Structure formats: C-alpha cells, structure tokens
Amino acid sequence: MPKMKTKSSAKKRFKVRSSGGIKRSQAFKRHILTKKTTKSKRQLRGMTEVHASDEKLIRAMLPYA
C-alpha cells in the first residue's frame, strides 16, 4: 500500500501539540487592520486550540502528525 499524503494546506496551518491537541493561528489578522482597535489586534496574537468538532477532519489531513 502506498504512503498516505499529508495535505500541504493543513501542514502550513496547524501544529500538533505533544499533549495531542491541535493549535491554529487566529483569523482576521492579515490586512485591513487600520479599522481594528489595538485591543482587538492584540487579542488576535498567538495560537488557539482547534474546536473538538473540527479535530477529526484535521487529523485525517495530517496522517503522520
């Protein structure tokens, strides 16, 4: 049986933690930042946990993670 391929889009967007959870970066932080407040931009920093309902789909895209 051939090797399973990892989805490149998922590889770039998600990181699997040692505890088994999946991290993702926040949306709405790329452009059109002038109308967003400093507080809202600060709260978009860093990574957040993927929702449990999406986790199964992401794990299928990352077979070796």
UniProtKB/Swiss-Prot annotation:
One of its GO terms (molecular function) is structural constituent of ribosome. PROSITE patterns: RIBOSOMAL_L35. Keywords: Ribonucleoprotein, Ribosomal protein. Residues 1-16 have a biased composition (Basic residues). SUPFAM superfamilies: L35p-like. The keyword Metal-binding does not apply. Residues 1-26 are annotated as: Disordered. The keyword Ribonucleoprotein applies. One of its GO terms (biological process) is translation. GO terms for cellular component: cytosolic large ribosomal subunit. Belongs to the bacterial ribosomal protein bL35 family. This is Large ribosomal subunit protein bL35.
